[in-house]
Structure formats: structure tokens, C-alpha cells
């Protein structure tokens, strides 16, 4: 009988040692992959965050006067860098040619003319004198006067004929000993030149018949003729003279040819009118103004 208490005592000691061993063993953390997923308040796994959608790809088609080629190319790079997904496609030419292309159905979101005349002819808000065909291509409320330019008399390097003013140009034309370049009659710079000749009382047709005038289909062609010294002088915009490195010997006054205003407008048939308006707004901001002013434009909007 004395063996039973001893046996019970031994069993108690064994159970006590086993319990101590269980308490001393450190807990093993579950592998990271087995950790419970984050849950919502309802106890369900939280949905994974979806990546932000890529910006919609937009191609803006902009028709702009040839005299804006350098500045608008620089602004394109600035705008596209700040607006991923937007691509600007330009069509540079004379404002008269661009107007005709718009009339014939060419795709265009935004039109910038080198003179009000071409824009007026597309704007239904203009009277019959300015818009004789009653065309309606301009989105109402979008039109702004964007820039002002100057009409300049320029000469080739070295100024071989010594022309230093419009007054001297007129005297040389009357004497018939000069070859002079100007834009065609459907080109704004040509129309401004016609006003200057009329201001001085000269007959353009007689001068052309006498072989004293050569023509360019846009301001860039006139600029090239002077740059290459194919003529003795020419009339272009001050901004084109700056970009081409030509010497300006005189600048026309408002009395001579009027104010040189560049209007801009979104077109009614624009595929992306909101984006076109945003681009137009950008071009009236400080970054674009700095580019325009660097070549001689005067921002108006």
C-alpha cells in the first residue's frame, strides 16, 4: 500500500514538468504568406487598388499662319510635355490658303490667321461686308485677338542698294532701279504691302508689269527671296525678319497699313473643341507670351 502514494507523487511531478515545458516554448510566427489578408469592416478582403487610367490620346489639328512657324513649334514642345496624351499637328501656310482649305472641309480644330480678313470670312457673327458668303465655321464665343505683329522693310546682307526707309523704297521704285519682293494679294502680308503702296500713291500693276516686283505665296517665300539676295528688298513681318536674321531698315505705321492683328478661334467642326480651347488658353498664358515676345510679337489676349 505504501507504493501507491509514491507512484502518484511521481506522476504528478511528470505532469508538472510537461506543463512548464509548454509555457517556455516561444511562439512561432506564421509565414508572411499565411498572414491574414486586410479585411473590410464586413470581414471581406479589401479590393486591390486599380491603377489610374492612362490619359486619352488626343490629336489637335491647328492651322496657323506661316509667320508663326518658329514660335508655335516651340510652344508645341512645351505644351505636349505638360499635357501627356495630347499631340499637336500643325498646318502652316498663308492665311488665305488655310481659309480655303477650311472651306473645302479640311480637318481643323483651331485656326490662327495673320489678319482679321480671313477669319471674318469664316465667322457668321460678321456682317455681309466682312463675310459676304455667310460662312459659318467659327465656334461662337471662342474667337480672340491673340497677337499683334509689325510690317517691316528688310534688306539682304550688306544692303547693296542702300535702302534705309519706306520713303527711299518708293523713290527707288519710281526710278525703276530696284527689284522688290512682296506677298501675293491673297496673303495677309501682301495685303498689308498693297496698302503701303496705295498710301504712297503707287500703282502695283504698273510696277509688276515693269518687272520691279516679285511675289511669294506666303511670307516665308518672300523672306527667302530677301535672305538669298534674289531681290534688293522686301516687305515681311518683323517676327520673320528676326527669325531669319534679316536687317529691318524701317517699320510701317498704322496709318500706312493698319494694325496687324492675329485672331484665333476654335472651329465648329473641331473634333476636340474642349482640348482646342485649352490649348488656346495656354497660348494666352505667361509661358507662351514669353516665346511670342522673344521674336517681336505683342500678346493681346
Stretches found by the model and what they are:
Residues 1-11:
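Positively charged n-region of N-terminal signal peptides that target proteins for export
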Residues 14, 104-105, 228, 273:
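Alpha-helix termination/capping residues and helix-transition junctions
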Residues 15-19:
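C-terminal motif of bacterial Sec signal peptides marking the signal peptidase cleavage site
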Residues 21-41, 47-81, 96, 115-116, ...:
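Exported/periplasmic ABC-transporter solute-binding proteins
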Residues 88:
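Hydrophobic anchor at the start of a short beta-strand
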Residues 99, 105-134, 140-145:
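Short beta-strand-centered segments that line the small-molecule binding cleft or hinge
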Amino acid at each position: 500500500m505504501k507504493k501507491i502514494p509514491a507512484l502518484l507523487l511521481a506522476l504528478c511531478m511528470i505532469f508538472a514538468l510537461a506543463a512548464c515545458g509548454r509555457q517556455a516554448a516561444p511562439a512561432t510566427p506564421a509565414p508572411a504568406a499565411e498572414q491574414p489578408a486586410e479585411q473590410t469592416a464586413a470581414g471581406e478582403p479589401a479590393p486591390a487598388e486599380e491603377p489610374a487610367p492612362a490619359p486619352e490620346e488626343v490629336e489637335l489639328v491647328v492651322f496657323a499662319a506661316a509667320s508663326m512657324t518658329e514660335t508655335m513649334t516651340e510652344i508645341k514642345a512645351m505644351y505636349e510635355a505638360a499635357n501627356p496624351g495630347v499631340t499637336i499637328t500643325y498646318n502652316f501656310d498663308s492665311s488665305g490658303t488655310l481659309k480655303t482649305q477650311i472651306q473645302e472641309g479640311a480637318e481643323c480644330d483651331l485656326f490662327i490667321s495673320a489678319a482679321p480678313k480671313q477669319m471674318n470670312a469664316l465667322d457668321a457673327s460678321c456682317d455681309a461686308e466682312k463675310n459676304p458668303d455667310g460662312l459659318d465655321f467659327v465656334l461662337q464665343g471662342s474667337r480672340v485677338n491673340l497677337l499683334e505683329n509689325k510690317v517691316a522693310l528688310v534688306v539682304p546682307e550688306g544692303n547693296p542698294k542702300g535702302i534705309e526707309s519706306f520713303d527711299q523704297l518708293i523713290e527707288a521704285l519710281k526710278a525703276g532701279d530696284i527689284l522688290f519682293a512682296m506677298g501675293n494679294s491673297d496673303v495677309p502680308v501682301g495685303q498689308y504691302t498693297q496698302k503701303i503702296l496705295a498710301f504712297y500713291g503707287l500703282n502695283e500693276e504698273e510696277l509688276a508689269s515693269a518687272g520691279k516686283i516679285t511675289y511669294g505665296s506666303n511670307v516665308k517665300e518672300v523672306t527667302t527671296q530677301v535672305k538669298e539676295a534674289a531681290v534688293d528688298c522686301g516687305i515681311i513681318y518683323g517676327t520673320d525678319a528676326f527669325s531669319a536674321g534679316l536687317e529691318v531698315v524701317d517699320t510701317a505705321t498704322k496709318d500706312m497699313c493698319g494694325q496687324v492683328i492675329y485672331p484665333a478661334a476654335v472651329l465648329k467642326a473641331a473634333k476636340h473643341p474642349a482640348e482646342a480651347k485649352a490649348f488656346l488658353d495656354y497660348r494666352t498664358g505667361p509661358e507662351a507670351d514669353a516665346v511670342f515676345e522673344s521674336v517681336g510679337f505683342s500678346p493681346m489676349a
